[in-house]
Structure formats: C-alpha cells, structure tokens
C-alpha cells in the first residue's frame, strides 16, 4: 500500500497510512484534544485551511451521521489521527469517516504518533504542513512547503454570499456569518428566535434595514485583524441594539472597541477547557477553537473582563460597561462539548428585553 507523508515546516517528517481523499494538500497544522465530536470538528468552518490533528488515539468508530454537521461543506485541509476505524458502529451512522472524507475531498493520514506531533506543535507553535504520497520527491515537497503562502481571506471563503432566513416567532436576530456553526442556529431555534443570517461584509445601515432586536457575531477562521469592514459595522451598531459575539465575534467586538489581538502559540482547540466567570467564581467546562486571543493589557476602560481561562488566564469573555453588548471566546453552543455555558443565549435575550424597556 502507498504510504502518505506528513511534512512539517520545520522539516519533521511523519509516515503513515492514507485514508480519505487521494490528494496532496498544504495548510496550517493544529491539534484538537477532544475525545469525541470529530464530525462536528471536521465540519466546523473555523478549521478552514487547517490540517486537523486529533490527539485522541482512535477516531471514526461511530461513523458520520446526518445530525451532527456544523456545516454541509467542510473546508479543513486534512485530518491526522493515530488510528482510524475503518468500520463504524452506531445506530445513527450513515457512512464511515473514510467514505465521508473521500466524498468531501479531504485527505487523511493514520498511524501517526500524534503525541509526538502534538508536542512539536506545543513547543514550536502552529506551522505550515504538507500531506502527500511518498512517491513524490521529499525535497521538492519541502521546497514547495517553504514557498507556500497561506491565504488570508478565509472568512470570505466560508461566509454566506447572500442573506437567508431561519424563521421563528420570537425576537428578530441578525446573525453575521463569519463561518457560522449550525449549532448556534439550533440554540436560537430552541428559543423560537427569528433569525436572518447575513454575509460577513454587511454594513451597519444594512443591519438596521432588517429591523433587528439584537446582533449576533458568529465564530469563524483566521485573523480578526483582516476584517476592518466588520469593525466599522460593529461600531455603527453598538449602543443602538444589544450585541453578542462568539469566538471570532468576540475578537472582532474587542477590536472594534480599541483592544488588540495576538496569535497564540498553539491555541485552544478542544472540549474540556475550564473557564472562570470572574463575577461569581463559577467554573464552566467549555468547547473552544481559536488560535488568536484578546490581549488583556490592551483592553480599554469601556470593556471589562467577564471570563478567563483557568490554565493560562486567556481572556475568555468581555462586556461593555456602557452599552448592552458582550462576547465570549468559547462556544456556549458546544457541539461538540459540554453545555455548561448555554445560559449565555438566555442572557442575551434577557438583555434585549431589558434594552427594550430602557430605550422606550
């Protein structure tokens, strides 16, 4: 059987068995520490352009089902596992992980020492990597990898091109799609909200034409500093209607208010990250997927930190002192992961009710 190579930007080479699509790819290599939820992770648009390493030793044993998609068209570049299950056993499964990746054009590699790979990423940071068959010249692949410039328009690639509705009978929410997870829509649907999903480059004027009760800023991939138009939109909306941001939305909300963001060494990607709510001391276990973070020292007086990571004190949530607006770095929608923080959707809707009363 043909072997598949994983070549890192620092020159490290791993050899493994191929599965999924039979193509060569290059992307940023990252790791996810979740024990389950590989379908949600692979279909999460926040992994756009990235080669996704799973640290859990066996991936694929329950297959792929129709209910756990976070997007219909996944855009991660590749999947790296220690061992892939070629058979799937679950009453909901429709196909194996191998078959799914073949259909979606995503290559995979198994038989990799993912512990060693993760250690490299932790020590040296995320980096470019190439996944290719071993019939190719290794030196040629290394030269190509060094010369590759990864794209920066990742959100433009995954955001909806046109607005569309997710009807409900409750509050009107405009949801800006920076790489939207379907689980966010499901959380609002549970609460009967009337949602309009809009492209990433919508203007403040276009937002108000939709007569919203609140603005939701979704998750998404890439560097938040690449979206100056989104910052202008947020500044034009805040103070007029409540705002809630998640992940990329959190970073954009912070930038729009004068804070700075920085690229993390290896990021937070997994479903077991403990976060402290500063006001109450409450500890929530959260789902996270981000390679950038808000710099605490850069926060203006108008923003207060509401949540922080237990382990490294990363800013995990902020709230505006003057306007009805807040954001969190983690995913309260979970999917996959714990639902400890799903109450934040209720707090957003309660904020809308309070704002209606005070603004009359």
From Swiss-Prot:
SUPFAM superfamilies: Carbamoyl phosphate synthetase, small subunit N-terminal domain, Class I glutamine amidotransferase-like. L-glutamine binds at residues 46, 220, 222, 248, 251, 289, 291-292. Residues 1-169 are annotated as: CPSase. One of its GO terms (molecular function) is carbamoyl-phosphate synthase (glutamine-hydrolyzing) activity. The active site is at 247 (nucleophile), 331, 333. GO terms for biological process: 'de novo' pyrimidine nucleobase biosynthetic process; 'de novo' UMP biosynthetic process; glutamine metabolic process; L-arginine biosynthetic process. Keywords: Amino-acid biosynthesis, Arginine biosynthesis, ATP-binding, Glutamine amidotransferase, Ligase, Nucleotide-binding, Pyrimidine biosynthesis. It catalyses: hydrogencarbonate + L-glutamine + 2 ATP + H2O = carbamoyl phosphate + L-glutamate + 2 ADP + phosphate + 2 H(+). Belongs to the CarA family. This is Carbamoyl phosphate synthase small chain. The lineage of its organism: Bacteria, Bacillati, Bacillota, Bacilli, Lactobacillales. The gene is carA.
